[in-house]
């Protein structure tokens, strides 16, 4: 009879968790930042607030965003005007829209990841689903499993209302699942739709206005597993370590409250300073075991919370401008898609590395870092190891 220790060892994978495929998706409706102030104040019936509109225009101009994809259309706002008010009861209709659409958008990204992976979906053993948009039972994970036709025995983890750091959280969770379950293949999906946070402008809520200028909709999926079969699977990045911490005395720095009026967004103006002053400690703890202290020797996947955060991190760590190119590109083309952003950036980096004929998936570098920042104020730190392009 096998001992507990023997059973435990047999259940574990031998190698590190590895990202094997990536897929992304967005809604069809695209809005351009250059004329978004006109659009936003028109659809929320707020064109009389001329001074606030000028202020919002300046926020949009400084956002470094070119365009975003948003599920909510002008027609939907005409049908449900309470969504476009600043503080009108609207949670029921928001929930109706979100709980239907979040799994659908997640499905689009998941199908792309599954196609790239190239294996039967019956081989997916675990599903990790994350969204800040809507809550119900059974959850979006259950709906997605059915939409995709996954096995009823798929082991599901549902993460609601984690916010912008959760792209790191899902990778940390998938890493633990893959490494502690031999043969596991984990489908990870982040799907975000801003119907829950959209609202009209108010002179008394400039932090809400910042959110309206930054956030976009999108979904991303990755497949994670240990000990890949190189004959049929194409490794992209290894997940070497993963950690989470929160910054003391920063509980309200980034916050969201679910109320009858939807999810309200609150932001302290010193968030860029809080993150930049604490990020090096996270880096040191993560990379000391590897003997790495030159942050410019890493490839970077940083959640693009906004240009001020990226500028502050860049300045504090003396990063070369090119280090956050992939991050800034995703911010520019999609806006802040909360948990999905870092997975979009991973996709951008491996594509950019392939196009540029780099030696590895990490822009030719071996080691990289993925950061998520969000409510708490919480920081997720994932150490990545790239894969040589010749094995790809």
From Swiss-Prot:
E.C. number, please? 2.3.1.95
Its name, as the record gives it, is Stilbene synthase 2
Q: Does the keyword Signal apply?
A: no
Task: Reply yes or no: does the keyword Disulfide bond apply.
Answer: no
Q: Where in the cell is it found?
A: Cytoplasm
Q: What induces it?
A: By stress.
Q: Name one GO cellular component term.
A: cytoplasm
Question: What family does the Swiss-Prot or TrEMBL record give for this protein?
Answer: Belongs to the thiolase-like superfamily. Chalcone/stilbene synthases family.
Fill in the subunit field for this protein.
Answer: Homodimer.
The GO terms describing molecular function are: trihydroxystilbene synthase activity
Catalytic activity, reaction form? 4-coumaroyl-CoA + 3 malonyl-CoA + 3 H(+) = trans-resveratrol + 4 CO2 + 4 CoA
Per the UniProt record, the source organism is: Vitis vinifera
Q: What is its main location?
A: cytoplasm
Q: What does this protein do?
A: Mediates resistance to pathogens which are sensitive to stilbenes.
Lineage, opening ranks: Eukaryota, Viridiplantae, Streptophyta, Embryophyta, Tracheophyta
Pathway listed for it? Phytoalexin biosynthesis; 3,4',5-trihydroxystilbene biosynthesis; 3,4',5-trihydroxystilbene from trans-4-coumarate: step 2/2
Task: Please list the residues that bind substrate.
Answer: 55-58, 267, 305-307
Q: Where is the active site?
A: 164
Gene Ontology BP annotations = biosynthetic process; defense response
The protein's superkingdom reads: Eukaryota
Q: Which of UniProt's keywords are assigned here?
A: Acyltransferase, Cytoplasm, Plant defense, Stress response, Transferase
């Amino acid at each position: 009879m096998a001992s507990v220790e023997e059973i435990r060892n047999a259940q574990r994978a031998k190698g590190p968790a590895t990202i094997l495929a990536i897929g992304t998706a967005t809604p069809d409706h695209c809005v351009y930042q250059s004329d978004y102030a006109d659009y936003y104040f028109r659809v929320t019936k707020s064109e009389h607030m001329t001074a606030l509109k000028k202020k919002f225009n300046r926020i949009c101009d400084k956002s470094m965003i070119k365009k975003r994809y948003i599920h909510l259309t002008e027609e939907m706002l005409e049908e449900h005007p309470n969504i476009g008010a600043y503080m009108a009861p609207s949670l029921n209709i928001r929930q109706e829209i979100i709980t239907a659409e979040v799994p659908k958008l997640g499905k689009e990204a998941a199908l792309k990841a599954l196609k790239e992976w190239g294996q039967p979906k019956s081989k997916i053993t675990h599903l990790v689903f994350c969204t800040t948009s809507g809550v119900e039972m059974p959850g979006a994970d259950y709906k997605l499993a059915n939409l995709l036709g996954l096995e009823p025995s798929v082991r599901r983890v549902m993460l609601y209302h984690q916010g912008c750091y959760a792209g790191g959280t899902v990778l940390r969770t998938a890493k633990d699942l893959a490494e502690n379950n031999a043969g596991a293949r984990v489908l990870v999906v982040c799907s975000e739709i801003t119907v829950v946070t959209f609202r009209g402008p108010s002179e008394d809520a400039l932090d809400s206005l910042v959110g309206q200028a930054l956030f976009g909709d999108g979904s991303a999926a990755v497949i994670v597993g240990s000990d890949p079969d190189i004959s049929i699977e194409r490794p992209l990045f290894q997940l070497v370590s993963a950690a989470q911490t929160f910054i003391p005395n920063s509980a309200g720095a980034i916050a969201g409250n679910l109320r009858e009026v939807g999810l309200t967004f609150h932001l302290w103006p010193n968030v860029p300073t809080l993150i930049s002053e604490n990020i090096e400690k996270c880096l040191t703890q993560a990379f000391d075991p590897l003997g790495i202290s030159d942050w410019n020797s890493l490839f970077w996947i940083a959640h693009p919370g906004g240009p001020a955060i990226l500028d502050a991190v860049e300045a504090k760590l003396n990063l070369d401008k090119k280090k956050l190119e992939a991050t800034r590109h995703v911010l520019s083309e999609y806006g802040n898609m909360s948990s999905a952003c870092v997975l979009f950036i991973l996709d951008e980096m491996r594509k950019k590395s392939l196009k540029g004929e780099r030696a590895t998936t990490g822009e030719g570098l071996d080691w990289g870092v993925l950061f998520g920042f969000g409510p708490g104020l919480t920081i997720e730190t994932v150490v990545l190891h790239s894969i040589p392009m010749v094995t790809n």
